[in-house]
């Protein structure tokens, strides 16, 4: 089977939006229009038609990725394949957005014409910057009262620091929103309501918009001309740029992440989505426009894979879902090569060969089984047993390990126990499945109490996972009070910390002796072990045991038994015994030395700090700020919400003080405020707070020995 669509005609895009910006409607309309053009294009070939279009107008993608085909609004483009990757709008699921950004080539940011740029929009924008994802912006809901396209343009420039370049301006607004002016063609596009926007016509620009259209067109052409010397020279010499030249200039600068083309419409009123699809094709990159993906081979040497079918197979698993009909579905993005169903691939991070049982392609609400996938494709595999989100799948003969996704450490934990004996076994299976799907969710058993502990990114995150356990797996569970994930670290350097483990009791004894140096590391650097032994005073074969001894001790700090982070440990000296020394003795000696060193190196307790944003009516601003301050919060700024919608308060607050915040915010503001919260960083807990925590843990390490 050969490729149906060349890789240059692929677009792997995400549609991301704040919760209320109308992402679902926009996506539904995309499926509606692409389905119709697909059907129109295929009927004469006698191919199967997609008759679900007539039966169902309300298609919502439950799938993580869906494939659509587009031949342009006027049917004048060669057929393009658009893979749409779903991205959630809620900030507690930043992790979901993060993993979809990792596999996108381009994004369409949807904004509400009234609300404009909102807190979650900023989070998504930052992640798109992190992965260098080119984007276009679609200002939706232009039929709403208070709609203002140009205000959203200013917000993208001022708040998000994006160079937003309108390539359309609206014709009318609110109830009188009729269509758009296409600034490239300099024509008005008016959609036909009777055909649900399938038909449209080009008209002359209304006279009252002519001057405004010319002004914005001039700005757009200037941005396009900066793409290369030839265009710039032509522009500066006063020669007009052709339609193709404008588009190629805008495309080059969008793909280079220098500008963000802006469009507008109303998905609900069937206006503008069709032109947005044309913009996806005109301005967003194909997999072939994106640089080769970098990875490492088994010896950790840097290698790359180009987006071509004749390269060895490489893919990234970006989402795992449990499907009631087929079991575990693994969604993956193919970066290079070809793979057929039935082929064996290697998961190098698990050192495990897996057979791809079946490969499925999602089309809106139906799935098609396909025999093979090519570079640039996004599909789902059935039959892969052991895999975690972010793992690489590769050709076993040409191994590459793609850059792992970075997942934040959980900041909150809860004990969870099954209600009945029957739930016990089901709960274990359910929790493991959920942890496989979501790497920011962890499950462990507490060694002392035997309880099952679940950890995640926030109260809401854990609530939803417990709810899914009940809904999808039928497990009833009781949940304990949330616990904060504190950490411990050191603030000063200590040298000559000695640890000696000696046992001579007849027969073969034990002997291990080490001298360590402990130093604080900058935040986020983690644990580092350095071997500085000279002259073989500690034999080479025992050095990994020293590292292991320290690593094991890191799990239990000396203040309150919390994990230790950001410490550099150097093995500087030691001694050994020809007969009695062994790995275990050096492991024990290292553990003793590290504990002693921690006590001497000014240990401190760290607590997770959250970035909190509260949207509140103006009357309650004082109450909200006072309440945040009483929670040891630092208010970092306040600004007006666009469209006279009250105030946005930004603050940094310790997670420990935020439990039950949604309830108290409701009572403070008569239920009229909303908030979002995401993990920011760890910070040293004030002395009084640390003392209380240490006391509550029964002086932690002392109690644990």
Curated annotation (Swiss-Prot):
Q: Which PROSITE patterns does the record match to this protein?
A: G_TR_2
The region annotated as signal peptide is none
Key words, A-Z: Cytoplasm, Elongation factor, GTP-binding, Nucleotide-binding, Protein biosynthesis
Q: What is its main location?
A: cytoplasm
* Biological-process GO terms, alphabetical: ribosome disassembly
Q: Where in the cell is it found?
A: Cytoplasm
What InterPro entries does the record point to? EFG_II (IPR041095), EFG_III (IPR009022), EFG_III/V (IPR035647), EFG_IV (IPR047872), EFG_V (IPR035649), EFG_V-like (IPR000640), EFTu-like_2 (IPR004161), P-loop_NTPase (IPR027417)
What are the residue boundaries of the tr-type G domain, all occurrences included? 8-288
Quote the record's binding site residues for GTP: 17-24, 86-90, 140-143
* Task performed by this protein: Catalyzes the GTP-dependent ribosomal translocation step during translation elongation. During this step, the ribosome changes from the pre-translocational (PRE) to the post-translocational (POST) state as the newly formed A-site-bound peptidyl-tRNA and P-site-bound deacylated tRNA move to the P and E sites, respectively. Catalyzes the coordinated movement of the two tRNA molecules, the mRNA and conformational changes in the ribosome.
Q: Which HAMAP family match?
A: EF_G_EF_2_B
* Similarity annotation: Belongs to the TRAFAC class translation factor GTPase superfamily. Classic translation factor GTPase family. EF-G/EF-2 subfamily.
Protein name, UniProt field: Elongation factor G 2
Species, as recorded: Bordetella parapertussis (strain 12822 / ATCC BAA-587 / NCTC 13253)
């Amino acid at each position: 089977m050969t490729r149906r669509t060349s890789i240059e005609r692929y677009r792997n895009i995400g549609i991301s939006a704040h919760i209320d910006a109308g992402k679902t409607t926009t996506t539904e309309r995309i499926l509606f229009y692409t389905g119709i053009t697909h059907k129109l294009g295929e009927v004469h070939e006698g191919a199967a038609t997609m008759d679900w279009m007539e039966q169902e107008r309300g298609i919502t993608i439950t799938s993580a990725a869906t494939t659509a085909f587009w031949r342009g609004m006027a049917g004048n483009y060669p057929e393009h394949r658009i893979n749409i990757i779903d991205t959630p709008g809620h900030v507690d699921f930043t992790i979901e957005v993060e993993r979809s950004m990792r596999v996108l080539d381009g994004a369409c940011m949807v904004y509400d014409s009234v609300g404009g740029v909102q807190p979650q929009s900023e989070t998504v924008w930052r992640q798109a910057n992190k992965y260098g994802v080119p984007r276009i912006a679609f200002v939706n809901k232009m039929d709403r009262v208070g709609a203002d396209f140009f205000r959203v343009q200013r917000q993208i420039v001022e708040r998000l620091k994006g160079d937003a370049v309108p390539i359309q301006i609206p014709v009318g607004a609110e109830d009188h929103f009729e269509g758009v002016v296409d600034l490239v063609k300099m024509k008005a596009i008016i959609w036909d309501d009777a055909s649900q926007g399938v038909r449209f016509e080009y008209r002359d620009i209304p006279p009252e918009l002519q001057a405004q259209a010319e002004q914005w067109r001039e700005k757009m052409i200037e941005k396009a001309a900066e793409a290369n010397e030839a265009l710039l020279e032509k522009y500066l010499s006063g020669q007009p740029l052709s339609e193709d030249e404008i588009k190629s200039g805008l495309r080059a600068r969008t793909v280079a992440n220098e500008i963000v083309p802006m469009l507008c419409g109303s998905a609900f009123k069937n206006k503008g989505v069709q032109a947005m699809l044309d913009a996806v094709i005109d301005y967003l990159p194909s997999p072939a426009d994106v640089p080769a993906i970098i990875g490492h081979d088994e010896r950790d040497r840097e290698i790359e894979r180009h987006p071509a079918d004749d390269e060895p197979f490489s893919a990234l698993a970006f989402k795992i879902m449990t499907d009631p009909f087929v079991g575990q579905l693994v969604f993956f993005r193919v970066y290079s090569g070809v793979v057929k169903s039935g082929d064996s691939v290697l998961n190098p991070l698990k050192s495990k060969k897996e057979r791809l049982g079946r490969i499925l392609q999602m089309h809106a609400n139906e799935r098609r089984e396909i025999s093979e996938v090519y570079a640039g494709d996004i599909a789902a595999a059935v039959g892969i047993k052991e895999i975690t989100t972010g793992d690489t799948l590769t050709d076993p003969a040409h191994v590459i390990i793609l850059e792992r996704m970075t997942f934040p450490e959980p900041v909150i934990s809860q004990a969870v126990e099954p209600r009945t004996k029957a739930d016990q076994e089901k709960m274990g299976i359910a929790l493991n499945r959920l942890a496989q799907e979501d790497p920011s969710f962890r499950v462990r058993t507490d060694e002392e109490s035997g309880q099952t502990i679940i950890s995640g990114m926030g109260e809401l995150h854990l609530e939803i996972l417990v709810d899914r356990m009940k809904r999808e797996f039928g497990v009833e569970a009781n949940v304990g009070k949330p616990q904060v994930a504190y950490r411990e670290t050191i603030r000063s350097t200590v040298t000559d910390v000695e640890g000696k483990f000696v046992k001579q009791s007849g027969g073969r004894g034990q002997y291990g002796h080490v001298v360590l140096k402990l130093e604080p590391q900058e935040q986020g650097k983690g644990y580092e072990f350095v071997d500085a032994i000279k002259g073989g005073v500690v034999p080479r074969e025992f050095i990994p045991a020293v590292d292991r001894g320290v690593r094991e001790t890191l799990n239990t700090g000396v203040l309150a038994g919390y994990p230790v982070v950001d410490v550099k440990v150097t093995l500087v000296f030691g001694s050994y015994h020809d007969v009695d020394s062994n790995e275990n003795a050096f492991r024990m000696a290292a553990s003793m030395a590290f504990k002693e060193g921690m006590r001497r190196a000014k240990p401190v307790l760290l607590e997770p700090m959250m970035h909190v944003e509260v949207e509140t009516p103006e009357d309650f601003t004082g109450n909200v700020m006072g309440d945040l301050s009483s929670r040891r919060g630092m208010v970092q700024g306040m600004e007006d919400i666009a469209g006279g919608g009250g105030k946005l308060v930004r603050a940094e607050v310790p997670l420990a003080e935020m439990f039950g915040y949604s309830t108290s915010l409701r009572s403070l503001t008569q239920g009229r405020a909303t908030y979002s919260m995401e993990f920011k960083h760890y910070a040293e807990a004030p002395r009084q707070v640390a003392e209380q925590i240490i006391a509550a843990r029964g002086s932690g390490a002392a109690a644990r020995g």
